[in-house]
Amino acid sequence: MPELPEVETTRRGIAPHLEGQRVSRVVVRDRRLRWPIPEDLDVRLSGQRIVSVERRAKYLLINAEVGTLISHLGMSGNLRLVELGLPAAKHEHVDIELESGLMLRYTDPRRFGAMLWSLDPLNHELLLRLGPEPLTDLFDGERLFQLSRGRSMAVKPFIMDNAVVVGVGNIYATEALFAAGIDPRREAGGISRARYLKLAIEIKRVLAAAIEQGGTTLRDFIGGDGQPGYFQQELFVYGRGGQPCKVCGTELREVKLGQRASVYCPRCQR
């Protein structure tokens, strides 16, 4: 699943080619995504100029002169720019045609993504209750410490809760906990303020590094400019269960936490 760095990489890839451009037509070949694509999307968006492309959590907000297209990449979706008129292949569900001669093409084999329309996107039900962005000053270790008090759940699903902080998905939660030396199974409410301060720093560092390097390469992810990211080669623990820790050599263990695989080092993480 594309996580926050992958979505931000997509935003950075497509924004320069969309902002200031006028939409000439919207072609929808299959409306059956996680939520159906609005029947009148072509009418609403065609003829409008795209003002900006923003990101909130893992949602992309394509802001037109009136209204916003809210897009989510789901489990395996991607947005990329192609030449106008390029024939569509299987799973290529939407084309947003631009007067520049390019198209923004949405591909989603599993159809678990979304393309919705809103006149007030930040108050849309999907975005309204989201926590702060992890790379802003609204998120820090003190927030983690305060929200964790009395919580018996494991720390990993706690930091993956979008009401606590957005965009800390499985890959980056795993890596940040390793960098902070915290066992992902530990009870969230039992972790000290000092350790949460360290964890928040590592969450910011890991996410910023992934964004800077183009996002993590996953089998189904393609960046907005058609190029995959390349951060996976630097992962310390994610996807490496049973292999030696890159720091101490201890065999990494894999467990299930909240229905997700979690890899950790029993020596480096306490």
Curated annotation (Swiss-Prot):
EC number assigned by the record: 3.2.2.23, 4.2.99.18
GO biological process: base-excision repair
Residues noted as binding DNA in the record, renumbered to the chain: H91, R110, R151
Name used for this protein in its record: Formamidopyrimidine-DNA glycosylase
Self-association and partners: Monomer.
UniProt keyword annotations, A-Z: DNA damage, DNA repair, DNA-binding, Glycosidase, Hydrolase, Lyase, Metal-binding, Multifunctional enzyme, Zinc, Zinc-finger
Cofactor annotation remark: Binds 1 zinc ion per subunit.
Disulfide linkage: none
Protein family: Belongs to the FPG family.
Zinc is among the record's keywords: yes
Function: Involved in base excision repair of DNA damaged by oxidation or by mutagenic agents. Acts as a DNA glycosylase that recognizes and removes damaged bases. Has a preference for oxidized purines, such as 7,8-dihydro-8-oxoguanine (8-oxoG). Has AP (apurinic/apyrimidinic) lyase activity and introduces nicks in the DNA strand. Cleaves the DNA backbone by beta-delta elimination to generate a single-strand break at the site of the removed base with both 3'- and 5'-phosphates.
UniProt-annotated catalytic positions: P2 (schiff-base intermediate with dna), E3 (proton donor), K58 (proton donor), R260 (proton donor)
Entries under Pfam families matching the protein: Fapy_DNA_glyco (PF01149), H2TH (PF06831), zf-FPG_IleRS (PF06827)
Necessary cofactors: Zn(2+)
Catalytic reaction annotation: Hydrolysis of DNA containing ring-opened 7-methylguanine residues, releasing 2,6-diamino-4-hydroxy-5-(N-methyl)formamidopyrimidine; 2'-deoxyribonucleotide-(2'-deoxyribose 5'-phosphate)-2'-deoxyribonucleotide-DNA = a 3'-end 2'-deoxyribonucleotide-(2,3-dehydro-2,3-deoxyribose 5'-phosphate)-DNA + a 5'-end 5'-phospho-2'-deoxyribonucleoside-DNA + H(+)
GO MF annotation: an example: damaged DNA binding
Zn finger (FPG-type) start-end: 236-270
